[in-house]
């Protein structure tokens, strides 16, 4: 019975202290993302969003090209 009490006390103390130290930045982010400035919403986060978008698109294109290559390779049987 002691173990659940100790773990519950640790969880409660960690969650309450962490919650008090964080600043609520939701209104700032809402203002940023709701601004009508012509930038797509998936790029409004800054440089990190630009890099993440480019990497994601590169991986998607690379995966698609590799899938087409594998299908083409599998569709032509080897000569024995």
From Swiss-Prot:
It is found in: Mitochondrion inner membrane. Residues 76-80 are mitochondrial intermembrane. Keywords: Membrane, Mitochondrion, Mitochondrion inner membrane, Oxidoreductase, Transit peptide, Transmembrane, Transmembrane helix. One of its GO terms (cellular component) is mitochondrial inner membrane. Pfam families: COX7a. GO terms for biological process: mitochondrial electron transport, cytochrome c to oxygen; mitochondrial respirasome assembly; regulation of oxidative phosphorylation. GO terms for molecular function: oxidoreductase activity. It is a single-pass membrane protein. Residues 22-46 are mitochondrial matrix. The keyword Coiled coil does not apply. The keyword S-adenosyl-L-methionine does not apply. Pathway: Energy metabolism; oxidative phosphorylation. Signal peptide: none annotated. The chain crosses the membrane at residues 47-75. Its main location: mitochondrion. SUPFAM superfamilies: Mitochondrial cytochrome c oxidase subunit VIIa. InterPro entries: COX7a, Cyt_c_oxidase_su7a_sf, Cytc_oxidase_su7a_met. Residues 1-21 form a transit peptide. Component of the mitochondrial respiratory complex IV (CIV, also named cytochrome c oxidase complex), the last enzyme in the mitochondrial electron transport chain which drives oxidative phosphorylation. The CIV complex is the component of the respiratory chain that catalyzes the reduction of oxygen to water. Acts as an assembly factor that specifically drives the homodimerization of CIV complexes, mediating the formation of mitochondrial respiratory supercomplexes (respirasomes) containing two CIV: supercomplxes with two molecules of CIV show improved activity. Belongs to the cytochrome c oxidase VIIa family. PANTHER family: CYTOCHROME C OXIDASE POLYPEPTIDE 7A, CYTOCHROME C OXIDASE SUBUNIT 7A1, MITOCHONDRIAL. Component of the complex IV (CIV, cytochrome c oxidase), a multisubunit enzyme composed of 14 subunits. The complex is composed of a catalytic core of 3 subunits MT-CO1, MT-CO2 and MT-CO3, encoded in the mitochondrial DNA, and 11 supernumerary subunits COX4I1 (or COX4I2), COX5A, COX5B, COX6A2 (or COX6A1), COX6B1 (or COX6B2), COX6C, COX7A1 (or COX7A2), COX7B, COX7C, COX8B and NDUFA4, which are encoded in the nuclear genome. This is Cytochrome c oxidase subunit 7A1, mitochondrial. It comes from Saimiri sciureus (Common squirrel monkey).
